[in-house]
Amino acid sequence: MFFLFSYCAFAEGSKVSEVRFEGLKKTKESYVQKLLEKYAGMEEENVDIKEIETLLQAQGLFSEINVSLSSEGEETPHTVIVIKVKEKITFLPLPFASYSSDGFMGGFMLMNMNAFGKKYTLVGGGIFSPSAQTGMLAFAKPAVDMQHPGFSFYTSLSRKNLEFLNFAGDTVMENKYFTAAADLSVSEKLLPFFTCSIGSHFDMADVLETDEYPVLYQWAGTMSFSLQNVNWNGWYLISQSASLKGELGWSSEDRLIGGCSFKGELQVPFVPRVRGILSGAGAFTYNQNEVFRLSKSSGASAILDSKFRTDFIAGTGFTVEAALLKRKFGTVSVYGSYEYVIVHDFDDTFKSSNGPGFGGKLYLQQVAFPAVVMGAAYNIKRNKWQYVISVGVNF
């Protein structure tokens, strides 16, 4: 429950002398104070309580936020911003499972979404399915401002029995792989809504039980730019975001490789509990081995086969999401969507399809990520449904 308190009655000209937090347990006060340091010395009539709520909601660390202004001091009146919070559960061992049109997937993750009390993210664990076994470790430190850059690291090892499908759903490639990947990047928040990052990415694939491929390696330097603006309306964090990422590198096949990806999202609240989401995403690779082809997630597509692979994909869609109820345990929502996607197929032609989707989500109030996601999408051109039910992690 969030409350806005009128501050018109406070003495004119009173300035903010302190931002006072109550209820912090794991979160370091120095971290959240830094988020709000611009309010120090601000005239109290210029304090935007809704903006403070949005800044804190965007951290994903608090289930309850109560902001008020307090006038203190008789001889020299000053204003204190009082913020009472209740922290979410951000550290937990998390078993998860997912069942989709492509089969079962499960695993276990040890997740800390507020490591060191500064919203550092530390995740480690394994993902298992009949066709793949993956171990992974990830760490991320967010960029706060120009003086405090961000840092992220990701690595994974997998043994996979993968088949690649073309647009029609036919198997065009099937092999057993041992793969490894690593990603390292640093980021700088140049403006409150604009972040730039540079890094490097490494991939390795050893195709087992065949001599057709040698062990494949590729390395690339990466650069990305992202824009994001959020606004809390009491039900959702309404977001407008865009990002662009490019990579350029070299492969073990002695050739220059590259690629580019983009995504954008515009959210509009129709009423407080109903929002529209216009989204788009796409990617292409240049000169990369077919083993490293893109999946449907690069185009934010739900209607394609999960085993489909391509070197070019672009998709756009529109979603309407409505929150049915909000209780102490969390929020339940339903959504309907429609998407269009175009891809470059294995036969060197471009093909497209479109179709509707629908589903529901459960966001638990006390944890920092979705708890249950159920969805289905229909590919009109192929007359085929794709569906997924996941518990613990949003796949």
Give the residues covered by each predicted segment.
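Bacterial N-terminal signal peptides
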Residues: M1-S6
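Periplasmic polypeptide-binding modules associated with outer-membrane biogenesis and secretion
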Residues: A11-Y99, M109, G125-K141, M204-D206, ...
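Short, solvent-exposed loop/turn segments that connect beta-strands within catalytic domains
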Residues: E74-P77, P272, R327-G330, Q366-A368
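Gram-negative/organellar outer-membrane beta-barrel architecture
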Residues: T76, K84-G234, Q240, L294-S301, ...
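Short, glycine/charged-rich beta-strand-loop motifs at protein surfaces that mediate ligand recognition
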Residues: V172, H344-F350
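C-terminal outer-membrane beta-barrel translocator/porin domains of Gram-negative envelope proteins
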Residues: T222-Y338, H344-F346, A376, V391-G392
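Short glycine-rich, acidic/polar surface loops and turns
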Residues: G355-L362
